[in-house]
Amino acid sequence: LIAFVYCSVLYAQHIKLFSQEKIVILGNKYVAQNIILDAMNIDAEESIFSYNLGELQDNVESIEFVKSVKVSRILPSTLMIQILERAPIILVLLDDEKYFFDIDQTPLLANKEAINFFPVPIMTFTNDDPIKLGDFQLTTALRFVIKSKAIHNELYENLSEVRYKNNNLSLITDERTKIDLGDDEAIYKISILKEFQHTINDKRSLNDYSYIDLKIDNQIIV
């Protein structure tokens, strides 16, 4: 039996039965296929069994905007690459660079192509000291975006800018409504804003107002 299996393998190699003839890449929307193929660095003449699937996976996962990868073989001669891309939720403008961040707070360098591809709100800081990657204020601001999106996704989907000015937080909607949240209890105020929106829903929307002020406790000024 062992001899039969060995001979079968030799014969398959001889006729190049398992030579890689096709690569199927699924799930990529932003990351170009040629970038993925370059990262894999494979030889089309090799058998699909000559590759370490774990190494191929690691190589593709090293590409920015790729979150996870599954590599599998389909006999006799196909490699399948299933891609899960990162989904940016905010574009942060820092002094020296622009970064996207996803729900895991992973920084992703934002070039012009990426900015045009991902239509997400921007976050700006106007502070005495410049904000840098890893700063506590940036981490806090990202947590606010993630939590507020979970609480009031309708507002997030209509958001153009998240604006910090010396710790005072303002939101600007796509229709240019300015929502002032002040410098504390921002998440609680998002919940209040959601309730307010439900209250007025039959008659008007938040975009009907040019200005909404929640800086004063237990008050909404429009």
Stretches found by the model and what they are:
Residues 1-10:
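Hydrophobic membrane-insertion alpha-helices, especially the h-region
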Residues 9-114:
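Terminal hydrophobic membrane-targeting helix
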Residues 18-20, 31, 64, 74-78, ...:
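Extracytoplasmic
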Residues 27-29, 83-87, 124-127, 173-175, ...:
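Flexible glycine-/small-residue-rich
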Residues 47-49, 90-93, 130-136, 181-183, ...:
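Solvent-exposed, non-transmembrane alpha-helical starts
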Residues 79-161:
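Extracytoplasmic segments of membrane-associated envelope/inner-membrane machinery
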Residues 135-199:
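Soluble extracytoplasmic domains of inner/organellar membrane proteins
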Residues 183-222:
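Extracytoplasmic/luminal low-complexity segments enriched in Pro/Gly and acidic/polar residues
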